[in-house]
Every structure is written in structure tokens, then in C-alpha cells.
Amino acid sequence: MSMQDPLADMLTRIRNAQMAEKSVVSMPSSTLKVAVAKVLKDEGYIAGYQISSETKPLLSIELKYFEGRPVIEEVKRVSRPGLRQYKSVEELPKVRGGLGVSIVSTNKGVMTDRAARAAGVGGEVLCTVF
């Protein structure tokens, strides 16, 4: 079976690993996954990430916990292959009143909703994280 939505697979692996209280989760790497991992690290949702290039590139994400609880409380895929969600800068959603972040793919790269608003660009809303 082929993987139809690699980003949804990444988010599901992170969610499952945190429920199992794993410290590191690995997955096949791609440019988009690395860009999303960079945003998650910059926002403090993960401790770090690393790309190992053996035969196939693997992305390893070091998960972050606070007082025994996962830092990522909720992660949801918004735009999916069957229903893409493109938003202008005015329509970019705020997650939980601004406490969480939306990760947006713009023509200036993958960034948070706050960074996209500051840059004055809209784009495809990939996922929300709280």
C-alpha cells in the first residue's frame, strides 16, 4: 500500500509516540517534513530533529515532555490531498485564541500563521498544533 498523505503519517507517528511516551520517533524524510519539524522546534513543541542519510533518509524527531505530559496536546491535519485548504493572510486561522499555531506553506516557505501574517502572505494551511 502506498502512502497517500506523508504529512498526515508524520503527525500520526508523533501523536502515537507521545501517547506511548517514547523519547524519539523516526520516519521517512522529505523536504516538507523537515520544514514542518523545523517550525515545531522553533516554536518549542519538539526538543529537536535529525536527518540520518543511510540508504534512505530518515527523519528522527526528539519529543518534548513537561512534568511527564507531552508538550503537544493536539495536532491536526487541516489541508489534505482530497480537500486542500488555501487561506489568504486575512483568513489565516488562530488556534485556540492564539495559544497554538497553524503551520502554513507559503511561497516564502513553511512558517507559522503569525510569521505569515507578519510577512503579509497566505497559503496552504497544513496543520494546527496546540
From Swiss-Prot:
One of its GO terms (molecular function) is rRNA binding. HAMAP family: Ribosomal_uS8_B. It comes from Pseudomonas fluorescens (strain Pf0-1). Keywords: Ribonucleoprotein, Ribosomal protein, RNA-binding, rRNA-binding. Belongs to the universal ribosomal protein uS8 family. GO terms for biological process: translation. SUPFAM superfamilies: Ribosomal protein S8. One of its GO terms (cellular component) is ribonucleoprotein complex. Part of the 30S ribosomal subunit. Contacts proteins S5 and S12. One of the primary rRNA binding proteins, it binds directly to 16S rRNA central domain where it helps coordinate assembly of the platform of the 30S subunit. This is Small ribosomal subunit protein uS8.
